[in-house]
């Protein structure tokens, strides 16, 4: 099992994730995504969007505002019910979520005893003000989830897109929660990104679609992101674990170095949200669906799929990371990312920094850069250049050598097994396209 310290070291060293405000000592639970991190996030987001919107004719996208009317959060139950139970250790002053520790045992931090304060409720929403006057009339919240922006746009999307039940609305965006404890690198933070889809169905079809989306989402992690199946599992919520809006819920959990934790939730939200907004807005017809064929009118039920984009980044790094002992006794660090997710698809290396080789290398770069994100490197030994690309997950390295001048062929070196092939320059584009399309992961890595 990979160690968390190895992932954190790689992430900072190679430019995936940096500590936010590091030059000023850092800000706990806040992280910046570097050149490779933004590419990995973008690629995961792209695959999610494709799987949700492009591969389903009845799902469309939305990008709702972070700031919304505070009445929305009162209607949704977040103002009154979106809270965690918090305790403090009276000896060391450490703060914990009450459901994360055993209050009958010693403090996890100081180990002195179980001298905790009584559990008290802590609302997770960030409150701020819009306008020049800071009073109750200008209060707004940073959204704690993207879902409510979808629900209040139910009628807008339904009418403008001419959709019929069942249909879905997908959204990727930032959410904010004033977590009692931020921990495990980018896993639990106050600012994060969600990939959510709300699927509206007839109440009688809720169970059928709930089962469909459970399997669909698990397949996404295994078949699209190529996450190891033996590190994924479903976990059902019992009645004591359900959120205030949910009738049923399943989590997809991944086995991180710190244990199995949620990466996506699939929830049967019933008609809770639409009914609440109909009530609080006093516009019930806006949230009602009229089936023109059957003449039936009803408030749709909702199935939610809610994945953490930032958690998916961490999961992908953990699952792809490997260390290999080579025959010469050296150690090779490899990120076995699916080529679709890799920040760079190709690295181009002139064997030596000679003009006759660099000119060809630059020409190949320009021919391919419209379709592939490419890293160009002409410094250092070829072995060290290979190792640098292995460590950031680049699947294919193309080397231009003196034979290239003679026969217009290059060496293509594959990341996972380090095999090399001579490929004609004119065939390079189609060769790499085919390799990416036919890529198969070895889950026994």
From Swiss-Prot:
Its EC number is 6.1.1.14. It is found in: Cytoplasm. One of its GO terms (biological process) is glycyl-tRNA aminoacylation. It catalyses: tRNA(Gly) + glycine + ATP = glycyl-tRNA(Gly) + AMP + diphosphate. This is Glycine--tRNA ligase. SUPFAM superfamilies: Class II aaRS ABD-related, Class II aaRS and biotin synthetases. Substrate binds at residues 97, 145, 192-196, 304-308. Keywords: Aminoacyl-tRNA synthetase, ATP-binding, Cytoplasm, Ligase, Nucleotide-binding, Protein biosynthesis. InterPro entries: aa-tRNA-synt_IIb, aa-tRNA-synth_II, aa-tRNA-synth_II/BPL/LPL, Anticodon-bd, Anticodon-bd_dom_sf, Gly-tRNA_synthase/POLG2, Gly_tRNA_ligase_bac, GlyRS-like_core. It comes from Borreliella burgdorferi (strain ZS7). GO terms for molecular function: ATP binding; glycine-tRNA ligase activity; protein dimerization activity. Homodimer.
């Amino acid at each position: 099992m990979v160690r968390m310290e190895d992932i954190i070291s790689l992430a900072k060293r190679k430019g995936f994730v940096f500590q936010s405000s590091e030059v000023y000592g850092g800000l706990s639970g806040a992280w910046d995504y570097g050149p490779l991190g933004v590419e990995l996030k973008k690629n995961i987001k792209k695959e999610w969007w494709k799987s949700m919107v492009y591969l389903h004719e009845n799902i469309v996208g939305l990008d709702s505002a972070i700031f919304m009317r505070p009445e929305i959060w009162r209607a949704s139950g977040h103002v009154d019910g979106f809270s965690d139970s918090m305790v403090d250790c009276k000896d060391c002053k450490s703060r914990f979520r009450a459901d994360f520790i055993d209050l009958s045992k010693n403090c996890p931090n100081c180990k002195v005893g179980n001298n905790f304060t009584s559990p008290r409720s802590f609302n997770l929403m960030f409150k701020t003000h819009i306008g020049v006057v800071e009073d109750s009339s200008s209060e707004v919240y940073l959204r704690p989830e993207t879902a409510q922006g979808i629900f209040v746009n139910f009628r807008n999307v339904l009418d403008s897109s001419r959709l019929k039940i069942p249909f879905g609305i997908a959204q990727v965006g930032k959410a904010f929660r004033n977590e009692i404890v931020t921990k495990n690198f980018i896993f639990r933070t106050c600012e994060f990104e969600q990939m959510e889809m709300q699927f509206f169905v007839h109440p009688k079809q809720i169970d059928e679609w709930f089962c469909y989306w459970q399997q669909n989402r698990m397949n996404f992690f295994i078949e699209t992101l190529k996450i190891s199946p033996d590190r994924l599992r479903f976990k059902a919520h019992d009645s004591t674990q359900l959120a205030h809006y949910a009738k049923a819920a399943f989590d997809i959990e991944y086995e991180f170095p710190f244990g199995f934790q949620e990466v996506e939730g699939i929830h049967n939200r019933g008609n809770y949200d639409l009914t609440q907004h109909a009530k609080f807005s006093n516009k019930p017809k806006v949230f009602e669906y009229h089936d023109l064929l059957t003449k039936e009118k009803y408030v749709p039920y909702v199935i939610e799929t809610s994945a953490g984009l930032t958690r998916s980044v961490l999961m992908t790094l953990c699952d792809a990371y490997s260390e290999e002992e080579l025959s010469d006794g050296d150690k090779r660090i490899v990120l076995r990312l699916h080529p679709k997710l890799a920040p760079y698809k190709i690295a181009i290396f002139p064997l030596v920094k000679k003009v006759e080789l660099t000119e060809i290398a630059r020409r190949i770069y320009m021919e391919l850069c419209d379709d592939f994100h490419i890293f160009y490197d002409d410094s250092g030994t070829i072995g060290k250049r290979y190792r640098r690309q292995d460590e950031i997950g680049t699947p294919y390295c193309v080397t231009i050598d003196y034979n290239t001048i003679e026969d217009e062929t290059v060496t293509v070196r594959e990341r996972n097994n380090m095999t090399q092939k001579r490929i004609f320059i004119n065939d390079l584009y189609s060769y790499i396209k085919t390799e990416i399309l036919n890529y198969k992961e070895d889950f026994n890595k």
